[in-house]
């Protein structure tokens, strides 16, 4: 499954920890969104990124291809805070993205 990653899932150390391999993919962007880091988890104190609509916004990231088994691991990592939705990247391709739930 191709997923547009705009946060920690782009980091090789996170990928290695989660799926046991480094996943690389093309840099691209989605228009009409911005990344906010305005939610701080009260348990760990970390500010997590989230993508929200913004008329003139643009979010850069990478399209990474994960297996179905890897996506299950990513879903657990992202918790109920995020859900997979369809989004169109700059090339016109429709891929998945973790959006705030």
Predicted regions and their residues:
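Glycine-aromatic micro-motifs
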Residues: 1-101
């Amino acid at each position: 499954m191709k997923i547009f990653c705009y946060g920690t899932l782009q980091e090789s150390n996170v990928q290695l920890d989660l799926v046991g391999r480094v996943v690389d993919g093309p840099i691209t962007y989605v228009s009409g969104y911005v990344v906010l880091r305005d939610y701080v988890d009260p348990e760990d104190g970390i500010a997590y990124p989230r993508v929200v609509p913004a008329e003139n916004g643009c979010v850069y990231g990478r399209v990474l291809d994960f297996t179905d088994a890897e996506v299950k691991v990513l879903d657990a990592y992202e918790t109920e805070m995020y859900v997979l939705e369809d989004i169109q990247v700059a090339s016109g391709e429709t891929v998945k993205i973790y959006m705030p739930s």
